[in-house]
Amino acid sequence: MNRDYLVIVPTYNEITSIGILLPQLLELNLDILVVDDGSPDGTADACRALGLESGRIVVVERKKKLGLGSAYKAGFKYGEDRGYKFLIEMDADGSHQVSDLLTLMSTMETSGSDLIIGSRWISGGAVQNWARRREWLSRSANVYARLLLGGKVKDMTAGFRIYRTAKLIQIDLASVKSEGYCFQIEMTKRMSQIDGVILEVPITFVERKYGVSKMSKKIVFEAIYRVTAWGLSAKFRRKRP
């Protein structure tokens, strides 16, 4: 079963965390694609070394920082071209638990869904070691996106996901322009637009122990701008005679 899955892990300066995560994934006999944005700390080299030992890790090293959305689109293309049935998104920083991944995979196998989202904000979901301000920001962002875009997904910004490739290929990835965490919102929206079956599964999100968060004002602004634009565009379309 695990040969049907590809884990896509974008990285930028995650040399400590990635050295913990990858061995855990290898214990599950999973294939892994690391998309590194030119990390100066040697993340790509560390991943390549693990790949030589296991034969299960491929590293795509890009020359500069191109963003989360671009990294995942590159990973999707790689997985689609090689016939993987399911494509997993997972953070490199250890915030997504491998124990939860097993639950997501099992649910994908049994539910017939097209997108499984590891959700912090449904019953049973949780976050650990977050400041109240950050939790408020994440919850508010998801409420805002849901109000403007519709749908029932509670955690549209979640980055712990499994896509069914047969459905994912129906999305024109070249037209997906979001770069930061807004990419997750846009992909949720696109999956809904093609009538994809989306299911949220509760997870526990644990704040990183090592490295620095990639969240920035630019990423937050992109999400506000794009979600507002999508929401207003949909509203005006509905009002047309």
Regions found by a protein language model. Name each.
Residues D36-D45, G94:
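A conserved acidic beta->alpha catalytic loop
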Residues T11, V35-D37, R62:
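Conserved sequence signature across two-component system core domains
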Residues M1-D4, G150-G151, A174-P241:
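Hydrophobic helical membrane-anchoring modules
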Residues R62-D81, F86, V98-Y181, R208-Y225:
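Acceptor/aglycone-binding surface of glycosyltransferases and processive sugar-polymer synthases
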Residues T16-I20, D41-L50:
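Acidic helix N-cap motif at the loop->helix transition within catalytic regions
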Residues Y12-E27:
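Short, well-formed alpha-helical segments that are part of the catalytic scaffolds
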Residues R3-Y5, L26-V34, G42, R56-I57:
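Short loop->beta transition adjacent to catalytic acidic/histidine clusters or analogous donor-positioning motifs
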